[in-house]
Swiss-Prot record:
One Pfam family cited in the UniProt record for this chain: Acyl-CoA_dh_N
Cofactor(s) essential for the protein: FAD
EC number: 1.3.8.11
Domain of life according to the entry: Bacteria
Species: Geobacter metallireducens (strain ATCC 53774 / DSM 7210 / GS-15)
Upper classification of the organism: Bacteria, Pseudomonadati, Thermodesulfobacteriota, Desulfuromonadia, Geobacterales
Protein name in the entry: Cyclohexane-1-carbonyl-CoA dehydrogenase
SUPFAM superfamilies: Acyl-CoA dehydrogenase C-terminal domain-like, Acyl-CoA dehydrogenase NM domain-like
Length: 380
């Protein structure tokens, strides 16, 4: 841990205990039913975790917001990735509002969000625009004191349950320099929930298509400057990618804990599994990857908290941790053997949950391009 402030230590221990005692018991049910446990969601709000990145006067942390977000996500993902995803999406979906909304807008909507415990959704991806954000076709046309937004968004986490949406739409035909963010209320006429997706993993969060059919929003709901939405999205990544890395880290740790326990208890050829050299190699490699991932993630989070550029480390942390999580969960199933393939044991769920961390907020192939670009900038 790179930030060892008393606040971080206290929060870490509080979350760790809550995750172990109150979130872990519901994890299998959350996965099986595709429904997040209501008591777990209430717990996340009660602990102040859903507003960690908000201004302090609206329930946010006084300092170290990036580190605390990563800490909370990691500890919860160790037991239930779906529950940890709620923290990530709340932070990601709120970022354009928090960093682009006018003071008047923030003072009007943030108290409502906190009081009513409203969920956010982040509407960026489209059927023809995933990693290529500049290809977004959803439009926002100025009409007097309003903007009229029309288009289709996909893979919208929290789409069916959110109360407010931050929507990236095209305000000019200037590629990525023609995009703008808007705040859209969940009850806005013309905003409709489309197909609810059936997912491989992290099933406790609802993901859907979203349709915007001439949705009218006040001009004051523009977040940041017009045509500067792409830059706001890139800044959002500097916060979200370490958090996703932390989720991958938590999943990897959870699988490692299960693997280690099983390898000590299960006997084969007259001795515990952990006494076999091939199993020891898996244990050693997994533990090393976990420690290396933690270093990258919390360095990136510390830079974010200091207001310093962390783009390279944020991508490195997400890339390394998510690849490590995929490998460690795969190896955990291998150590469990046939039992690991069965839903009676949590490692198969962790394996499915890990895959998303290699994809969302920029696929790992994109992370490699970002890392190389940043290195070449530094070398120029």
């Amino acid at each position: 841990m790179f930030n060892t402030s008393e606040e971080v230590r206290i929060v870490t221990e509080t979350i760790r205990q809550a995750a172990r005692e109150r979130i872990a018991p519901a994890a299998a049910s959350v996965d099986a039913t595709g429904e997040l446990d209501g008591e777990v969601l209430s717990l996340l709000w009660d602990l102040g975790l859903m507003t960690l990145v908000f201004p302090p006067e609206f329930g946010g942390a006084e300092q170290s917001q990036g580190t605390l977000l990563c800490t909370a996500v990691e500890e919860i993902a160790r037991h239930c990735a779906s529950s940890s995803l709620m923290l990530i999406i709340q932070a990601v979906g709120s970022f354009p509002l928090l960093h682009g909304g006018s003071r008047e807008l923030l003072e009007r909507v943030l108290p409502r969000i906190v009081e009513r415990r409203e969920l956010a959704a982040y509407l960026v991806s489209e059927p023809g625009a995933g990693s290529d954000v500049g290809s977004i076709r959803t439009t926002a046309v100025r009409d007097g004191n309003e903007y009229v937004i029309s288009g289709t968004k996909c893979f919208s986490t929290n789409g069916p349950v959110a109360s407010y949406y931050t929507v990236l739409a095209r305000t000019s035909e200037n590629g990525r320099n023609g995009l703008s963010f808007f705040l859209v209320d969940g009850d806005a006429p013309g905003l409709k929930v489309g197909k609810i997706e059936k997912k491989l993993g992290q099933r406790g969060s609802k993901t859907s298509e979203m349709y915007l059919d001439e949705v009218r929003v006040p001009a004051g709901n523009l977040l940041g400057e017009e045509n500067k939405g792409f830059l706001l999205a890139m800044k959002d990544f500097d916060m979200s990618r370490p958090a996703i890395g932390a989720q991958a880290l938590g999943i990897a740790e959870g699988a490692f804990d299960q693997m280690l326990k099983h390898s000590r208890e299960r006997k084969t050829f007259g001795q515990p599994l952990c006494e076999h050299q091939m199993i020891q190699q898996i244990i050693a490699d997994s533990a090393t990857k976990i420690e290396a991932a933690r270093g990258l993630i919390y360095r990136a989070a510390a830079l974010y908290d200091q207001g310093k550029r962390n783009t390279k480390l944020a991508s490195m942390g997400k890339l390394f941790a998510s690849d490590a999580a995929m490998q460690i969960t795969t190896d955990a199933i291998q150590v469990f053997g046939g039992y690991g393939y069965m839903q009676d044991y949590p490692v198969e769920r962790m394996f499915r949950d890990a895959k998303l961390t290699q994809i969302f907020e920029g696929a790992n192939q994109i992370q490699r391009l970002v890392i190389a670009r940043e290195i070449l900038k530094e070398a120029a």
